[in-house]
Regions:
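Juxtamembrane and targeting peptides
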Residues: 1-33
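A solvent-exposed, acidic/Ser-Thr-rich amphipathic alpha-helical stretch
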Residues: 2-6, 29-91
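Short beta-strand segments enriched in hydrophobic/aromatic residues
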Residues: 38, 99-101, 135-137
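Hydrophobic/aromatic beta-strand elements that line small-molecule binding cavities or substrate pockets
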Residues: 80-86, 100-101, 116-123
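A short hydrophobic beta-strand element
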Residues: 90-101
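Short beta-strand edge/turn micro-motifs at domain boundaries
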Residues: 113-148
Length: 149
């Protein structure tokens, strides 16, 4: 059990590092690493509704667009402040991940942080976690509250 928790922690540490690297100027985007983090199909649930998709060419194209959006609003880093792993069964866990999105607002140079929590459902086969579902809060609302959009 401890090894699985450590694997999930390392998985999200790598995920955060890839995200922060993609916010640098110039960006270093590890698209293959992001793609490899997800199962062949995955589901997102948010206040906008539930969406599902294939981990395929369209997803691969959307990744750099998402990072570009975060850079446009002043994103500088994606940091993990906590990870709590809940065992579901022998092959699946839920990870509650507390994130800190650090930014410098383009319009006035003010620095700040958007804190939020995502819940990820991961399937672990041969020690390799893959995200097959996640629940996220209202990202657009949080960005509006911080004057980023």
């Amino acid at each position: 059990m401890l090894k699985r928790h450590l694997n999930v922690q390392a998985f999200f540490d790598d995920y955060a590092e890839r995200s922060t690297d993609a916010l640098k100027n110039p960006p270093v985007e590890d698209i293959d690493g992001v793609v490899a983090s997800f199962a062949p199909f995955f589901v997102e649930s948010s206040p906008r509704g539930v969406m599902g998709g294939e981990n395929g060419p369209d997803f691969r194209k959307a990744i750099p667009q998402g990072f570009a959006h975060y850079r446009e609003v002043g994103g500088k880093a994606m940091r993990i402040t906590a990870v709590k792993v809940t065992e579901i069964d022998d092959a699946n866990v839920m990870a509650t991940v507390d994130w800190a999105f650090d930014y410098v607002r383009p319009k006035d140079g003010k620095a700040g942080t958007v804190n939020f929590t995502n819940r990820y459902f991961l399937n672990i086969v041969n020690g390799k976690p893959k995200i097959f579902a996640y629940i996220t809060p209202d990202e657009e609302k949080a960005m509006q509250e911080h004057g980023l959009v």
